[in-house]
Regions:
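Helix-to-loop junction immediately C-terminal to a conserved catalytic motif
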Residues: 55
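Conserved ABC ATPase "signature" region
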Residues: 101, 105, 111-127
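Conserved ABC ATPase signature
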Residues: 130-134
Length: 241
């Protein structure tokens, strides 16, 4: 299913060089609103660099990135965009609740929002536990909760399901779909092609090159394959051929 409304993100001829290496060679793409877009590709394909550019924290060589109608990194986006990095960005020596109260104060979110997001990410029984006593998956959910404090219009998530067991992964995708149903836009990166089945639209990236943009159904139709790993390999072979 594609969204005919305005795009949440527009990337135009984006070029990024890092340490003398061209990571993104002039990529252009758009991401629709109120949907889940999967940014998929192997490690080292440029996914995190692209996400950093969208967040406005990556130096770009040329091109442009527009987010919710504003230049990436614009100060007015701070309250409308949530970013969850692959490494949990929370304080290990504070409890779940203490972390969220701290970040709520920074975001200007009401105190009552803290307990709301704790329940949303299913950490109610662990709210008073120190983060250094949590599992990796639980720490990731604390990071997600901090990003949800301001009720963001756009949520950017870098490999959020890495290291999670199947049950937690299922529950997290259910949460993502609920957020999209409420009008949020989600951009989710992963190196696991099977995650594509949970997304409304897909962006397949390899070595900084956008190989495919469309729905999972369109990907399967183009490659004549129901297996997502095989579909990705087919797209790569088509590109190289």
């Amino acid at each position: 299913m594609m969204n005919d409304g305005p795009n949440a993100i527009a990337v135009d001829q984006l070029v990024i060089d890092r340490l003398g290496t061209r990571v993104l060679p002039g990529i252009s793409l758009s991401i629709p609103t109120a949907m889940i877009t999967g940014l998929l590709g192997p490690s080292g394909s440029g996914k995190t660099t692209l996400l950093r550019a969208i967040m406005g924290v990556q130096i770009i060589t040329s091109g442009s990135v527009t987010v919710l109608g504003l230049p990436a990194g614009h100060r007015d986006l701070r309250s409308t965009v949530g970013y969850v990095t692959q490494a949990p960005a929370v304080y290990l020596d504070l409890s779940v609740r203490e972390n969220l109260r701290y970040f709520a104060a920074i975001a200007g979110a009401p105190v009552g929002r803290v307990d709301e997001v704790i329940e949303v990410v299913d950490l109610g029984e662990l709210r008073d536990r120190r983060v250094d006593q949590l599992s990796g998956g639980q720490r990731s959910r604390v990071s997600l909760a901090t990003a949800l404090l301001g009720r963001p219009q756009l949520l950017v998530l870098d490999e959020p399901t890495v290291g999670l067991d199947p049950v937690l992964r299922r529950d997290l995708w259910a949460l993502f779909h609920n957020l999209a149903a409420e009008g949020a836009t989600l951009l989710v990166s992963s190196h696991v092609m099977q995650e594509a089945q949970h997304c409304d639209t897909l962006l397949l990236l390899r070595e900084g090159v956008l190989l495919f943009a469309g729905t999972p159904t369109q990907l399967q139709a183009r490659t004549h394959s129901d297996d997502l790993d095989e579909a990705f390999l087919s797209i790569v072979e088509q590109q190289e051929g």
